Amino acid sequence: PNDQLDEEYSDGDIMIQACSNDPQVTFHAIHNLIRPFRDIIKIRWSQHGFISAKKNETPRNLMAFKDGTVNPRKNSDLKKYIFINNGWAKNGTYCIIRRIQIHIETWDRTALEEQEAIFGRKRSTGAPLTGKKEFDNIDLNAKNSKGEYVIDENAHTRLAREVKTSIKRRAYNYNDGTNAKTGNLDTGLLFICFQKSIQQFINIQNNLGHNDKLNEYITHRGSASFLVLPGIQKGGYIGETLFS
């Protein structure tokens, strides 16, 4: 719901993700990989992204809030929510990519207290409004002295948590300069997530898309989904379980 997708940032048959500490290395890795196949493939779209965070720290998005705090980390959770359990794609996963534009100028004019209410978390620490530290449990039933929910009924954190599932987020910020027509910054989030079923993402996004207060400040411009093949054993090859 509420998607405004641009065809130039959507779909595709094969996804390649290259990561490095140097964007020039990343560029040449992709360039050299696809160069031999120019006669048979065409790049549909691409997006450079970046993360600014120390090792083992939760990175922040361009809205200055931590992004990915509730990622599953235990092997049992990864097995339950992320990796496909059976069939030829066993130990593979599904990848969803969303190119989300952030209306940063509007966001910057929003008071900090309102920003934190929208996310349901403290900007400084990433802690839920019902806790003190980033990884404290979220109490969705907590109310203030006025009888109001501490975490707003339409807060991003609440709506995402209401859906009883989990996904593995791996999001990147992007900055593509300014829009020539509006003069506004073209910045946002290249949201990437992994799950054993695409329906997990659909259920979460449906809940967010209808009521999330954050929707006033973001627009989903691109969307794509891919199957990530299982890893390989010694002597094997990528896609072996599919082609053998």
Which residues make up each language-model segment?
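Long, histidine/aromatic-enriched segments associated with O2/redox biology
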Residues: 1-244
